[in-house]
Amino acid sequence: MAKDYVTGKRTHFGNTRSHALNHSRRSWKANLQKVRILVDGKPKKVWVSARTLKSGKVTRV
């Protein structure tokens, strides 16, 4: 399972509830994108969330 290289964000699991309080398992997936960034001066392909890209915590190569 992929996770954000910078923040460690990954898929979360829980339940969805109906009005009758029935439940079934579901997952919330992070919006991960595979991008090339500089790691120790060398380009590397890593999974990064869209929020991390928008915030400017990493820059593409």
UniProtKB/Swiss-Prot annotation:
InterPro entries: Bacterial_rp_bL28 (IPR050096), Ribosomal_bL28 (IPR026569), Ribosomal_bL28/bL31-like_sf (IPR034704), Ribosomal_bL28_bact-type (IPR001383), Ribosomal_bL28_sf (IPR037147). Transmembrane segments: none annotated. It holds the Pfam family Ribosomal_L28. Residues 1-26 are annotated as: Disordered. Disulfide bonds: none annotated. Keywords: Ribonucleoprotein, Ribosomal protein. One of its GO terms (biological process) is translation. GO terms for molecular function: structural constituent of ribosome. GO terms for cellular component: ribonucleoprotein complex; ribosome. The keyword Ribonucleoprotein applies. Gene3D superfamilies: Ribosomal protein L28/L24 (2.30.170.40). NCBIfam families: L28. Belongs to the bacterial ribosomal protein bL28 family. PANTHER family: 50S RIBOSOMAL PROTEIN L28, LARGE RIBOSOMAL SUBUNIT PROTEIN BL28A. This is Large ribosomal subunit protein bL28. The lineage of its organism: Bacteria, Bacillati, Bacillota, Bacilli, Lactobacillales. The gene is rpmB.
